[in-house]
Amino acid sequence: MHVTPELAPVAKVGGLADVVFGLGRELEIRGNHVEIILPKYDCMRYDQIWGLQRTFDDLWVPWYGGAIHCSVYFGFVHGRKCFFIEPHSQDNFFNRGAVYGFHDDIFRFAFFSRAAMEFLWKAGKNPDIIHCHDWQTALVPVYLYEIYQPMGMRHPRVCFTIHNFKHQGVTGAQVLHASGLDRPEYYFHYDRLRDNHNPHAINLMKGGIVYANFVTTVSPRYAMEAKDQGQGFGLEPTLHIHHMKYGGVVNGIDYDVWNPEIDPHIPVHFNVDTIEGKYADKKALRDRLLLADNEKPIVSFVGRLDPQKGIELIRHALFYTLGQGGQFVLLGSSPDGAINGYFWGLKRQFNDNPDCHLEIGYNEELAHLVYAGSDVMVVPSRFEPCGLTQLIAMRYGTIPVVREIGGLADTVIDKDFSHRPLHERNGYVFRDYDERGLESALGRAIACYYQYPDHFRELMKNAMRYDYSWNHPGQDYLNIYHYIRDK
């Protein structure tokens, strides 16, 4: 049973939505019964829900000493069984036109988490595993063990996955009173929910770590960085205390969506044995973006223009690529107006350059063509819990140039400096977050493209041979589920 604030494609803000969908499908393929609970947002893509109907109309969720009436709807999202919780209250928790971005987000998702648990209890559902995600549902294990287990719900175990430690749900005591956790002095304890920095605040993510039976994050390297290298944003001591139930599992990507053999968004399909088709897609990308038709490598960036993603180095990659005789393509946008404005300025600056195209915004069809038609994909992140860009790029034979951080370090093996066998090397890696570091890796990629085309082609094939589907992560999560189920 997944309890989640997001699910692709109906309520997608970030990678969390793809993880819940992809993992859920993989677990079902392996013969498990999977259900998903999420809020019934007014902004969902209802055209992606099949057979939506009200299935439970007598759910009263405790809130501020009273109760809020909720309806529960059931429907299928691409075959996944989903329950959608709709509260009927003046707060309009989920009728606001967006998933996040409101001053009371902590209360909205504290309520949703309580509603999900109340639904499981009242509907007589008794899952083996409840899998919750990020701070938005971190109170699920707290509610389970402090409220519902004493009432008799003793069977479920909880796996809590942290997709990004940066956002933790730090707040005051009021949310405890609201949700029925009525002993603030009990929860304001270092071993429970009290924030590690602010003794007058509680930390929802910390509560999830303390109360869950197992805690995962989205790559082994990021798990280590969060615990030991300052990427836990204050939760390092808590992770050390609970290190025996903590680990990392690299996310997968959806091979039905990201598959150059069947992709409907690219003109020529290809695989590792017919890689020549990639060059036709490269020409199609040039034609679409009005780039010069020449022998230069296409270096690209696809993703959010967010400080986490390394904006300064993305900009430098553009200038460096052009200076080294390459072409550069960018597809992305930022919710930050200043960042968007800066890249619009760059777009105007290079508007007449036949070797550069910046597309400010996001276009799913174009993204597929960029992945298929590019030679190199830069991912110079400041920090990166997992990263899907490099996984998709490799699926399409596009060589990743990445910073040695988080999931990037777990998935990209440097062509020149790794001790791994040659057939396992699949990209270029740099360590320091600076221009020299980026140049050291991107320069080697461009030089290999020009000077050793046969080596570059083998590197493309190496990248395509890796399996970054949900096959391995699915088994890893099943192992975790069995481990906590049997304890």
UniProtKB/Swiss-Prot annotation:
CDD domains: GT5_Glycogen_synthase_DULL1-like (cd03791). Keywords: Glycogen biosynthesis, Glycosyltransferase, Transferase. It catalyses: [(1->4)-alpha-D-glucosyl](n) + ADP-alpha-D-glucose = [(1->4)-alpha-D-glucosyl](n+1) + ADP + H(+). SUPFAM superfamilies: UDP-Glycosyltransferase/glycogen phosphorylase. Pathway: Glycan biosynthesis; glycogen biosynthesis. Its EC number is 2.4.1.21. It is an enzyme of class 2 (transferase). GO terms for molecular function: alpha-1,4-glucan glucosyltransferase (ADP-glucose donor) activity; alpha-1,4-glucan glucosyltransferase (UDP-glucose donor) activity. One of its GO terms (biological process) is glycogen biosynthetic process. ADP-alpha-D-glucose binds at residue 12. NCBIfam families: glgA, PRK00654.2-4. Belongs to the glycosyltransferase 1 family. Bacterial/plant glycogen synthase subfamily. Synthesizes alpha-1,4-glucan chains using ADP-glucose. This is Glycogen synthase 2. It comes from Methylococcus capsulatus (strain ATCC 33009 / NCIMB 11132 / Bath). The lineage of its organism: Bacteria, Pseudomonadati, Pseudomonadota, Gammaproteobacteria, Methylococcales.
